[in-house]
Amino acid sequence: PAEAFDMPFGFSTGGGVIFGTTGGVMEAALRYAVEKVSGEKLKNVDFKMVRGLENIKSAELDVAGNKIRVGVVYGLAAAKKLADRIKSGEEKFDFVEVMACPGGCISGAGQPQTTADRRIKRMAGLYNADKTQQLQKPQDNFLVEQCYAESFGGCPGSHEAHNKLHTGYENRNDMFEVLDNVIAAKDAKVKVVAALSVTDNAGNVPA
């Protein structure tokens, strides 16, 4: 039977809901960052300039006199194009959201196969759910605030939070080559044992 998530995972803001669509991570981050930088309560939590199914989007905001340029991209081919533009100096961003799946998690491999029309409906569903939440901004989730206070160094961006909430990756090809060799050796041994177990009626191993 369906059950509610254990706390603190059962409590979320609209910012957590819209994470499932392209632009959602960016919008949730802006809801936090704009209020943090300006020092003023955010009156309008909707950042519609980062919404939509275009696979590359950009927007510029004025935050307390600072020009902030953000980018949103989904699909790794599109992400490479945008990365190349950034490397060449053609584009410059303060923050870029990248999602691999078309339209974001709403079309991820764990979802039923979909079409562009259904993606639009799924996206609209998340934004509608966002509106029904009592809280829309991530910083209004008191349970997240409690987690940071108790386990992550007191605030987002702290050294302790960075260490605990981020991971790193390194090339493991050498390890997989060793594993392949072990498997190949084991397969060869199995074949030899299988060959030795085949005998004729006199108990001789066929030549």
Task: Set out the residue ranges of the language-model regions.
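Iron-sulfur (Fe-S) cluster-binding modules
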Residues: P1-A207
